[in-house]
């Protein structure tokens, strides 16, 4: 494999463990409040913990100035309303739980209803005045080795967060830190007019492991906001200088990493103040008088720096009254607050969107609010690392816990893996070939019949899709049904190429839906429509039994009513019914009605639907091809296993959810034709989550996959088997090797021994999506898909070799989040310097281009991505019904991606 070497910077600064390092202990914190109607929050739980430490120090005779509380590393929750539940310390409190009864003063005041205490309410800015009695229980959870990378990572994340908020004076927004005092201004053009864009420079700090070392990665990150100030907007000639004149502008503001919409803007405008009868005052005086405490509290909690907060409020003489948005994506409602106007983000056209979105509409033109970093800021990130190395408070804090920090980044060679040689276009059926000399792409016409559709005809392979149907609700009308059938048929035939004559004309089946909304989403009318389809096919196949007629149906396109959020149970019911019958379905939402007319589908939607129909019927929409010199281009079977574990049942937290295992294997040289298997892992008292079943499960999966491969490859087993595994952390690798891989290897040895074949080259690769590493380009280097780093680990405890790859599309500045691929088992024990290892990387990158629904690269190999879809579809939609475990028919449901 020939890979381009790219000049890049990782900005990875290793940490080392000093000889003075001591073990760190993790503790659980449990606080029981005696006061009636009291709700424990973050601040009060910290006060209770402080009182607990004072009593513990008094009992042990410790120095109160540098006692237990001083040594704690508190894991503060992300929400102020949540209490502290755990902390860390190098002081050992013993293995037995310690309990103290404490008293502290809270800022919450008791609410009185009818002379009784009915709960507590917040006194945001006032001093703590309400006495609260609590029982605090501290339990040691575990002892962490100072050399353990995960324990160091936990401590570093907490220590860095505490240092930044206390001494460096930077604003923490999500995982980035921004300095609002040093913005740089740039200009962009929108609709021929220039708009000032304010780039707020910041840095993303992540702790990651690389080459067996824990380190701090510092990458520059920016936030683009409109730099035009609120004062300039208010003083523009808009007819009436009143906040209501800004109706065409939606103002968003940041507060504690959340986004608010501005309810009103107050600056220098006179109103009749309710503070004094009949007297006029200005908005700023009115709001600052009425909401002074709330404004101060919001500013202090936002910046956590008194001097900076006061200077901001003195310079900008107007206040933003913020109201929460409707609901965020995770269902939480943000609370209203007041913030200084200098922290506002201005977005035109009343666009309401969360912070950090990729595109927003401004005067019907796209403006990117990018969180990626321009190349010029990489030098600032390096300088920022030197600043951290010189920070005395940080160095002292790290030294107390036995950490050493270097200001010199770790240098690594980085490469770019080339995209697959052949890539089939999804509409024009053009094959794209890359020129090795200059990287130029040439388009060559290709016969569209390279990926014919296969179907079963009396258990014999045939070509085409003669029997399929379209079910349409009757209320959509005949014109809609005929147009839909015409467009779907033409598009599928264009995809089929030379096999197009074998694509039959689908019959239209009317579905009798009720006009009542409650009765519209019932599955029974679609079952009746299936009976009508069978009756129509009986006229053509008079002598065939019903089971034979059902076996002839290749696919059914079903139109279901919208909107999308209301069709959940109907969609699941349809999928369960037809999958049980062994029929592949493609669901399509009914179009929206506008002025008594149906809006037709977007062409991109129809193209995607037809691609799914073509793939579900047994065709390959496109096929990435490896170079002939790659050893995995011939006689290779790819496998992927993913286990879906749904959330626990609401109301019954003690119940263990049923897990679903999905297994995908390939049996064709193009790696596009798959064989799917599914099994339910039933938990019980001796087998809590079904883990003990995975040993026999993997053996059954690989036996069936080998039998399928034999059937399609002249009874010859593959020379190479590569298994991708998802959902395995570093702590689970040893158990996975012992439970799954060991028995799997012995099973394969028996299979190959019976076939008189030498044992295959078996590789098991774990894909970890939680990698925090990022790669950045320098000097105007253009990053492409397939950017990777070979991670050679000198640590003998780290099993196998690994590489980090960002295979999906590259955006400007930095790569997307890479995937960490760790080879946990290799029967050939290939070195990372071996060509076989590089060819394995090339295989991993090429398979990222094989997913049916996306014509470009995705983040994972398509077999692993489809294994995830299979397990999730069977667990959530099919509700763990009949297992797709063994099949007698070669061309059955398991040979088609019915779950995408």
Curated annotation (Swiss-Prot):
Q: Identify the gene encoding this protein.
A: Ago
Cited function: Plays an essential role in growth and, with Dicer, also involved in microRNA (miRNA)-mediated translational repression. The RNA interference pathway is implicated in antigenic variation having a role in regulation of variant-specific surface protein (VSP)-coding gene expression. Several VSP genes are transcribed but only transcripts encoding the VSP to be expressed accumulate. Antisense RNAs corresponding to the silenced VSP genes are detected.
What is the first-listed, main subcellular location in coarse terms? cytoplasm
Known partners and oligomeric status: Interacts with miR2. Highly specific binding to the mRNA m7G-cap. May be a component of the RNA-induced silencing complex (RISC), a sequence-specific, multicomponent nuclease that destroys or silences messenger RNAs homologous to the silencing trigger.
The record's annotation in PANTHER family points to: EUKARYOTIC TRANSLATION INITIATION FACTOR 2C
Q: Which InterPro entries match?
A: PAZ_dom (IPR003100), Piwi (IPR003165), RNaseH-like_sf (IPR012337), RNaseH_sf (IPR036397)
Protein name per UniProt: Protein argonaute
State the organism named in the record. Answer: Giardia intestinalis (strain ATCC 50803 / WB clone C6) (Giardia lamblia)
- Molecular functions per Gene Ontology: RNA binding
Report domain Piwi positions: 555-879
């Amino acid at each position: 494999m020939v890979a381009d070497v790219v000049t890049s910077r990782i900005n990875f600064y290793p940490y080392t463990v000093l000889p003075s390092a001591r073990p760190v202990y993790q503790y659980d914190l449990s606080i029981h409040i005696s006061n009636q109607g009291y709700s424990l929050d973050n601040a009060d739980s910290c006060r209770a913990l402080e009182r607990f430490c004072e009593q513990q120090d008094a009992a042990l005779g410790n120095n109160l100035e540098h006692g237990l509380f001083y040594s704690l590393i508190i894991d503060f929750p992300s929400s102020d309303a949540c209490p502290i539940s755990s902390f860390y310390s190098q002081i050992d409190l013993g293995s037995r739980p310690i309990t103290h009864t404490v008293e502290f003063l809270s800022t919450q005041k008791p609410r009185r209803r009818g002379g009784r205490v009915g709960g507590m309410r917040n006194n945001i800015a006032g001093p703590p005045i309400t006495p609260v009695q609590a029982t605090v229980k501290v339990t040691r959870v575990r002892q962490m080795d100072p050399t353990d990378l995960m324990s160091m990572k936990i401590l570093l994340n907490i220590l860095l967060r505490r240092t930044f908020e206390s001494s460096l004076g930077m604003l923490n927004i999500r995982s980035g830190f921004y300095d609002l005092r040093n913005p740089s201004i740039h200009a962009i053009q929108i609709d021929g007019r220039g708009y000032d864009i304010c780039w707020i420079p910041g840095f993303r700090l992540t702790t990651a492991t690389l080459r067996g070392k824990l380190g701090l990665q510092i990458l520059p990150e920016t936030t683009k906001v409109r730099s035009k100030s609120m004062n300039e907007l208010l003083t523009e000639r808009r007819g009436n200088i009143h906040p209501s004149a800004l109706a065409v502008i939606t103002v968003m503001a940041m507060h504690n990493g959340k986004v608010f919409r501005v309810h009103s803007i107050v600056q220098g405008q006179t109103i009749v103040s309710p503070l004094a009868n009949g007297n006029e005052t200005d908005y700023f005086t009115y709001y600052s008088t009425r909401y002074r405490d709330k404004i101060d509290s919001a500013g202090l909690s936002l910046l956590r720096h008194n001097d900076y907060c006061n200077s901001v409020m003195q310079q900008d003489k107007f206040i933003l009254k913020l109201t929460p948005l409707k609901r965020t994506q995770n269902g939480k409602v943000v609370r209203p607050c007041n913030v200084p106007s200098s922290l506002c983000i201005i977005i035109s056209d009343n666009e309401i969107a969360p912070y950090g979105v990729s595109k927003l509409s401004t005067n019907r033109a796209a403006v990117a609010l990018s969180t990626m970093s321009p190349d010029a800021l990489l030098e600032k990130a390096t300088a920022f690392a030197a600043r951290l190395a010189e920070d005395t408070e940080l160095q002292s804090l790290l030294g107390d816990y036995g950490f050493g920090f270097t200001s010199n980044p770790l240098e690594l060679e980085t490469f770019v893996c080339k995209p697959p040689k052949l890539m089939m276009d999804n509409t024009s059926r053009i094959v794209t070939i890359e020129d090795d000399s200059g990287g130029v792409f040439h388009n060559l016409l290709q016969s569209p019949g390279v990926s014919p559709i296969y179907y079963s005809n009396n258990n014999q392979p045939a070509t085409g899709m003669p029997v399929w149907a379209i079910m349409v609700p009757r209320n959509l009308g005949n014109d809609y049904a005929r147009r839909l059938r015409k467009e779907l048929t033409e598009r599928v035939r264009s995809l089929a190429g030379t096999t197009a004559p074998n694509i039959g004309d689908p019959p239209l089946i009317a579905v009798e839906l009720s006009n009542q909304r409650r009765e519209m989403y019932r599955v029974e009318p679609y079952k009746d429509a299936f009976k009508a389809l069978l009756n129509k096919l009986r006229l053509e196949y008079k002598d065939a039994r019903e089971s034979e007629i059902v076996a002839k149906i290749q696919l059914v396109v079903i139109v279901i009513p919208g909107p999308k959020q209301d069709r959940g149970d109907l969609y699941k019911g349809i999928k369960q019914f037809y999958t049980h019958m062994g029929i592949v379905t493609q669901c399509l939402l009914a179009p929206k009605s506008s002025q008594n007319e149906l809006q037709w589908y977007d062409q991109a939607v129809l193209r995607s639907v037809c691609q799914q129909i073509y793939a579900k019927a047994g065709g390959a929409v496109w096929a990435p091809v490896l170079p002939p010199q790659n050893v995995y281009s011939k006689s290779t079977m790819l496998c992927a296993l993913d286990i879906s574990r749904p959330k626990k049942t609401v109301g019954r937290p003690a119940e263990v959810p049923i897990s679903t295992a999905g297994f995908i294997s390939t049996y064709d040289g193009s790696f596009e034709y798959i064989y799917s298997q599914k099994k339910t892992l039933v938990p019980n008292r001796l087998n809590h989550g079904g883990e003990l079943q995975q040993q026999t499960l993997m053996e059954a999966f690989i036996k069936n996959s080998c039998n399928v491969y034999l059937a399609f490859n002249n009874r010859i087993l593959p020379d190479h088997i590569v298994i991708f595994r998802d959902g395995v952390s570093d702590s689970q690798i040893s158990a996975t090797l012992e439970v799954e891989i060991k028995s799997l290897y012995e099973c394969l040895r028996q299979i190959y021994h019976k076939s008189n074949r030498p044992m295959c080259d078996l590789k098991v690769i774990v894909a970890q999506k939680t990698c925090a590493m990022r790669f950045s380009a320098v000097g105007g280097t253009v990053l492409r898909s397939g950017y990777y780093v070979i991670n050679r680990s000198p640590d003998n405890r780290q099993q196998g070799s690994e590489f980090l790859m960002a295979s999906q599309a590259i955006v400007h500045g930095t790569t997307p989040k890479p995937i960490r691929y760790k080879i946990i088992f290799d029967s050939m024990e290939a070195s990372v310097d071996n060509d076989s290892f590089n060819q394995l990387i090339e295989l991993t990158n090429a398979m990222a281009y094989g997913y049916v629904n996306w014509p470009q690269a995705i983040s994972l190999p398509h077999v692993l991505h489809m294994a995830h879809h299979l397990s999730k579809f069977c667990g959530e939609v099919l509700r763990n019904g009949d297992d797709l475990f063994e099949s007698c028919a070669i061309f059955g449901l398991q040979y088609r991606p019915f779950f995408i």
